[in-house]
């Protein structure tokens, strides 16, 4: 996951992360959407979510996740921003539900 540059947006994103932390083992932030998505594709990461990146930030990673058999979707945040997220197919539904419960997507 990554965070926006606007401080008010970061505070909202931080609240989502705070809700997620007790429900996952760890959160890792590599700093590149495409590299995070490659981690999902290779199985070293269980999921990826980020609010507001541009298509050029994640497009290559999306192709790699889908080629590896994973699932990638773009949801919407409560603020109306795009929220790309991905996970292995067998885990995607549960991951997406968790993202909704934690306020990442509506």
Residue ranges of model-derived segments:
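An extended, acidic
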Residues: 1-106
């Amino acid at each position: 996951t990554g965070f926006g540059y606007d401080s008010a947006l970061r505070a909202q994103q931080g609240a989502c992360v705070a809700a997620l932390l007790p429900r996952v083992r760890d959160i890792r932030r590599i700093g590149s959407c495409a590299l995070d998505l490659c981690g999902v594709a290779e199985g070293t990461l269980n999921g990826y979510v980020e609010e507001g990146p541009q298509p050029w930030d994640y497009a290559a990673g999306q192709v790699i996740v889908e080629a590896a058999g994973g699932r990638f979707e773009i949801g919407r945040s409560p603020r109306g921003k795009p929220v790309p997220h991905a996970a292995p197919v067998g885990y995607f539904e549960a991951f997406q539900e968790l993202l909704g419960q934690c306020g990442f997507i509506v």
